[in-house]
Amino acid sequence: MSRAPDRIAACFDALRHSGRKALIPFITAGDPSLEATVPVMHALVRAGANIIELGVPFSDPMADGPTIQRSSERALGRGAGLAYVIEAVQEFRREDATTPVVLMGYLNPIEIHGTRRFAETAVAAGIDGVLLVDLPPEEADETRAIFTEVGLALIALASPTTGEARLDMLCSTAQGYLYYVSFSGVTGAADRLDTHAASDRLRQLRARAGAPVVAGFGIKDAASAAAMAVDADGVVVGSALVAALADASDVRSARKRAEDFLQPLRQALDAG
């Protein structure tokens, strides 16, 4: 099987050359509706998204706070499993061949699917990377090897409590980008970000990692996005966007909410 194009590397290269930071929104596939997922993805790109993280709904999302847990439950109730997520990316790719798409989720659905079969299916659909929050880096070699064979990036997570030995491993094996969790806890839980502590860590990581470093968890608005982006290659915004989309009444409303939410963040990043 041929390797996938490296859209993630091309994206960060273009951003670096233009002096801009990556804006990476997270949405749960299948929420606020099955029909809204792909239109919302396109709306986010129009509003300035550089990469899209698409959450794979899971019944026990232990790393996620209440907002994304509820979103995942709603999506599962509509039948949004892994097969639906892959089909959504296929549909997205009919109009957008360049914006990277990264799946974020848990190991169980992929193991049920079969890791190699999943990797090949994902690449064929146009998926660029996968972030598995419950896959310890010490146990990731086999999965990484399968993904690497087909050109699928295994995105890694680092946090303020990550030990030095594990951090060395993450930095040396980073693919696509390294996702720095800016505080310890579940998604959406931070009322106020400690940007000074996060900035110190981000500078260290960028000096050590063999891939771009992005910051996420707790970024809620334009101000927090701009603050975190100073020492990162990009920022991820998830829970606040998921909350903004949650009760959209139809596809048109979901598209508008996505654009209205993301545009100020894009403007803040570009102004910084």
Curated annotation (Swiss-Prot):
GO BP field: L-tryptophan biosynthetic process
Keyword DNA-binding: no
Pathway per the UniProt entry: Amino-acid biosynthesis; L-tryptophan biosynthesis; L-tryptophan from chorismate: step 5/5
EC number: 4.2.1.20
Keyword annotations: Amino-acid biosynthesis, Aromatic amino acid biosynthesis, Lyase, Tryptophan biosynthesis
SUPFAM superfamilies given in the database record: Ribulose-phoshate binding barrel
Entry annotated with the keyword Lyase: yes
Substrates-to-products reaction catalysed: (1S,2R)-1-C-(indol-3-yl)glycerol 3-phosphate + L-serine = D-glyceraldehyde 3-phosphate + L-tryptophan + H2O
UniProt cross-references to InterPro entries, sorted A to Z: Aldolase_TIM (IPR013785), RibuloseP-bd_barrel (IPR011060), Trp_synthase_alpha_AS (IPR018204), Trp_synthase_suA (IPR002028)
Domain of life: Bacteria
Family of this protein: Belongs to the TrpA family.
Chain's role: The alpha subunit is responsible for the aldol cleavage of indoleglycerol phosphate to indole and glyceraldehyde 3-phosphate.
Protein name: Tryptophan synthase alpha chain
Organism: Xanthomonas campestris pv. campestris (strain ATCC 33913 / DSM 3586 / NCPPB 528 / LMG 568 / P 25)
